[in-house]
């Protein structure tokens, strides 16, 4: 049950934007997540301090360097993995 609550909390914080061109609000970072179909998420900048989020960023750097195909930060992992990793930050 706690896992379900943490996933619901993650969905609130990881608000998916439908407009790719909109700017991220202050204190948030836009990232594109997914393997073939990329979805845009807004994550709090505090996630940058989390070791597991830093590992996702390292994976992104290895795959894309500084040339991201979406024009923003792209994290090459399945969407459910991203949600699982980031849902742990709310505990």
From Swiss-Prot:
Keyword Transit peptide: no
Topology term for the membrane: Peripheral membrane protein
Pfam short name (any one): Auxin_inducible
Compartments it resides in: Cell membrane
Keywords for this protein: Auxin signaling pathway, Cell membrane, Developmental protein, Growth regulation, Membrane
Gene Ontology BP annotations: auxin-activated signaling pathway; response to auxin
InterPro entries per the UniProt record, alphabetical: SAUR_fam
GO cellular component annotations of the record: plasma membrane
Cell membrane as UniProt keyword: yes
Induction per the UniProt record: Strongly induced by auxin.
Family as reported in the entry's similarity comment: Belongs to the ARG7 family.
Job of this protein: Functions as a positive effector of cell expansion through modulation of auxin transport.
Name of the molecule in the record: Auxin-responsive protein SAUR20
Native organism taxonomy: Eukaryota, Viridiplantae, Streptophyta, Embryophyta, Tracheophyta
